[in-house]
């Protein structure tokens, strides 16, 4: 669930709402049926995420979880609440020795930032995140990049001798 949230850029509510019928492992895609604003979108998955998702679906099947249950559920098919995930992530981060604040939406931010660093056009990032416009995505990325911009400015040199 955590890897999918990070590697797909989905909101935690979108991840928890996924049904097995929304996942196409052969094509490496999943469908968000009701994203923010009740919008539907298709998201691609990299091979590593697809493999992890396949492993989880195999575990579900092994435990007899009904196909009508959401992809991420209890082993009895019960739903997982967003608040559970919100409390789980900081605990997992602490046990991994991560001191920085960790929250579900930070995984979405990391996904967007990584796509930008890998050279994805802002229109592609917008579509994958399900944003209504590139301006929303740009604000999203600029807010994330503020620390980098400050660090870049701090590292600049000014050679007064050349003046």
List where the protein language model places each region.
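C-terminal catalytic core of Y-nucleophile DNA break-rejoin enzymes
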Residues: 35-55, 68-90
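Catalytic-site neighborhood detector that most strongly recognizes the C-terminal catalytic loop/helix
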Residues: 34, 129-154
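C-terminal secondary-structure termini that scaffold catalytic or DNA-interacting sites
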Residues: 155-163
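Short, polar N-cap/turn motifs at the start of nucleic acid-interacting alpha helices
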Residues: 23-25, 81, 99-101, 120-141
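Short helix-to-turn junction characteristic of helix-turn-helix DNA-binding domains
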Residues: 1, 5, 115-116
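The alpha-helix within a helix-turn-helix
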Residues: 5, 16, 126
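Conserved tyrosine-mediated DNA breakage-rejoining catalytic core shared by Y-recombinases
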Residues: 8, 12-13, 17-58
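Short, basic (Lys/Arg/His-rich) helix/loop patches that form interaction surfaces
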Residues: 43, 86-127
């Amino acid at each position: 669930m955590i890897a999918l949230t990070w590697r797909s850029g989905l909101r935690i509510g979108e991840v928890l709402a996924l049904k097995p019928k929304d996942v196409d492992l052969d094509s490496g895609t999943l469908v968000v049926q009701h994203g923010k604003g009740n919008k539907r979108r298709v998201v691609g998955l990299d091979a590593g995420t697809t493999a992890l998702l396949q492993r989880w679906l195999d575990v579900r099947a092994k435990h007899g979880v009904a196909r009508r249950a959401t992809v991420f559920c209890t082993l009895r098919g019960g739903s997982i609440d967003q608040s559970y995930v919100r409390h789980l992530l900081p605990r997992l981060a602490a046990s991994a020795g991560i001191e920085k604040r960790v929250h579900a939406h930070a995984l979405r931010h990391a996904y967007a930032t990584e796509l930008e660093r890998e050279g994805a056009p802002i229109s592609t990032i917008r579509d994958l995140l399900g944003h209504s416009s590139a301006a929303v995505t740009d604000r999203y990325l600029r807010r994330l990049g503020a620390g980098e911009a400050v660090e870049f400015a701090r590292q600049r040199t000014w050679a007064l001798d050349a003046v």
